[in-house]
Amino acid sequence: DKEQAAELTKYLESNAEGDNSTLHKVTIHSSFHQVTWADLEVEKVTEPVIDIKELEERTGSFQLEYMVSTRSGREKTYYHVREYYRIRYTPERMYLLDFDREMTQIFDENADVYANDKIMLGIVDKDVKMQESDGGNVFAFVSSNKLYSYNVADQKLARLFSFYGD
């Protein structure tokens, strides 16, 4: 709820350092719009797993990992989210010293992922690990820790490797 979240603006340091062009990487310098998931209506899928990175008398660093989803018609899209917070406590108030969120769409090879002769990976790091064959007919890429191969001539996508349970 953006109205409830408006209270958080006092903790943000929105400025030109924030990249407001993607939801993959959101920081303390991003706009309020980006920090509050822009126009995505996310639903929590899992409870956050909290990892205490540092804990001092007045400061602490924490990392949260969890899954969210969005819905488009009958299709659901899933995302892995990792958030990092560094906070300082004083008797008067708490200060957010740093915030970083990385959101990565879980690639679903069974969904409609083709558009304009491209494979749409969704919200991911712009530097996708990819390798092309010598003839250019086949290329392999990694998405969500899974290895895929795409045969351009046959227009076939195949998952080559993933860990058990993925």
Which stretches of residues belong to each language-model region?
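Short, surface-exposed charged micro-motifs
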Residues: 51-52, 84-86, 138
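A mature extracytoplasmic/lumenal domain signature
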Residues: 64-68, 100, 143-145, 154
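Residues that act as N-cap/strand-start positions at coil-to-secondary-structure junctions
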Residues: 44-47, 81, 124-126, 133
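Non-catalytic accessory regions used for complex assembly or targeting
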Residues: 9, 59, 91-94, 136
